[in-house]
């Protein structure tokens, strides 16, 4: 009996050394597991992007100089850029001193309007000195931190992604849907935000900053960029507005992907698509999704937000997607884009006749459009547009020059298509 008691006492002491926790309820154990997972995620996040959450990193003289070198590319012909670069090091030191002292570096905006695809857009451009500061903050803090929390199928204005990436992901999503169901029966919810930048609320935007920026000085600087626009909304033009607008509804994106477990979802800035098998389920998801958007102050465009049958095709990023019965995905340009290009070529012909443009410039613009169209199922559209360009300008810039060597002498000739 003494031996048994001694063994029991030893085990009890060992348990005490290891730490014996009191009896926990199911909810308490669930909370403890959640806290452990959260601490593990925070540690991984700190290892990945902890170095970017640093105010001094993006306000140093070297960071501002590098931001200036990146910001001046392609715009050195502007007077403001040239004047800044005449004394770039002195200007960088002055910006660093103001930021180190916590002073306001905002200088206001240049406001102008442009017409893009028939839409009148109000653009606000920054003074170049402030543009350099914001470029440094975006490169060294905002973009690496905010992009880390985005879903993979959100590729607007990010390095390595873009429109081509989004279109490829949409095609991949359709291929995955066909492999799962082996048909093209289903429904697509096409979503478009109305005046997205103008309707972004500041308080929800500040909540996004509070979740990601733990350095209080960096947090206050990013908030200052937003409050300079007025009571609500973000201005189109500053680089920080782009990454902020991308991350603004990211919480809803994760709700769709992680909580509702809907894989067939993609967002590109203010355009989104969501595919489901049942129309009734899609309507329920739509109503719940619209309620979440309303909490963020996001207003939907009633004309462009609609549910369509997958077999009829849908339009996303100016591209018409069709999932065929055999699993093939067709990508065709939308009709409006083709009409706009024909009108543009006719305008170029008028500019050439008036001496405002040379044929080479018109050819470069057309070849850019043509190269983009060659990635789509638009052979007939490209052929008809080639005929229109030849009839207007009497040249074929898409015909490449071939080079061969004969007895050490290069001979060039042009392929003549009949």
Annotate the PLM regions:
Residues 109, 266-270, 302-303:
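Short Gly/Ser/Thr- and Asp/Glu-enriched loop/turn motifs at secondary-structure junctions
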Residues 119-151, 230-257:
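Conserved pre-motif C helix in the palm subdomain of viral-like polymerases
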Residues 97-119, 132, 217-228:
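Reverse-transcriptase-like RNA-dependent polymerase core
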Residues 2-32, 126, 135, 225-229, ...:
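Right-hand nucleic-acid polymerase module
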Residues 51-54, 140-198:
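Active-site-proximal segment of RNA-dependent polymerases
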Residues 1-93, 411-418:
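Non-catalytic, polymerase-adjacent accessory regions of viral genome-replication enzymes
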């Amino acid at each position: 009996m003494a031996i048994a008691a001694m063994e029991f006492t030893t085990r009890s002491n060992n348990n005490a050394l290891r730490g014996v926790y009191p009896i926990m309820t199911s909810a308490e154990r669930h909370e403890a597991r959640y806290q452990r997972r959260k601490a593990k995620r925070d540690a991984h996040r700190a290892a990945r992007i902890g170095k970017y959450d640093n105010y001094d990193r993006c306000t140093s003289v070297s960071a501002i100089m590098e931001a200036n070198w990146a910001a001046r590319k392609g715009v050195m012909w502007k007077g403001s850029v040239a004047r800044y670069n005449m004394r770039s090091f002195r200007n960088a030191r002055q910006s660093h001193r103001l930021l180190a002292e916590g002073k306001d570096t905002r200088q206001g905006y240049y406001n102008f309007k442009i017409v893009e695809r028939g839409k009148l857009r109000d653009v606000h451009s920054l003074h170049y000195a402030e543009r350099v500061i914001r470029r440094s903050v975006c490169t060294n803090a905002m973009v690496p931190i905010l992009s880390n929390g985005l879903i993979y199928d959100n590729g607007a204005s990010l390095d390595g992604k873009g429109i081509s990436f989004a279109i490829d992901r949409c095609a991949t999503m359709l291929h995955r849907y066909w492999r799962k169901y082996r048909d093209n029966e289903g429904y697509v919810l096409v979503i478009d935000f109305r005046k997205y930048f103008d309707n972004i609320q500041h308080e929800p935007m500040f909540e996004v900053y509070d979740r990601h920026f733990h350095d209080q000085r960096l947090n206050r600087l990013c908030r200052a960029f937003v409050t300079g626009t007025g009571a609500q909304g973000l201005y189109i033009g500053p680089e920080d507005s782009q990454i902020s607008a991308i991350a603004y509804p990211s919480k809803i994106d994760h709700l769709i992907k992680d909580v509702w477990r809907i894989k067939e979802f993609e967002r590109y800035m203010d355009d989104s698509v969501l595919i489901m098998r049942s129309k009734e389920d899609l309507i329920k998801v739509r109503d719940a999704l619209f309620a979440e958007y309303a909490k963020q102050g996001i207003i939907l465009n009633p004309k462009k937000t609609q549910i369509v049958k997958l077999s009829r095709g849908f339009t996303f990023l100016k591209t018409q997607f069709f999932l065929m019965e055999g699993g093939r995905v067709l990508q065709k340009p939308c009709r409006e884009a083709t009409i706009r290009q024909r009108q543009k070529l006719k305008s170029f012909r008028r500019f050439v006749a008036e001496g405002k443009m040379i044929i080479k410039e018109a050819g470069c613009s057309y070849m850019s459009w043509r190269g983009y169209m060659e990635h789509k199922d638009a052979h007939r559209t490209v052929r008809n547009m080639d005929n229109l360009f030849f009839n207007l300008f009497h040249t074929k810039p898409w015909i490449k020059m071939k080079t061969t060597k004969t007895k050490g002498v290069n001979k060039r000739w042009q392929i003549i298509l009949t």
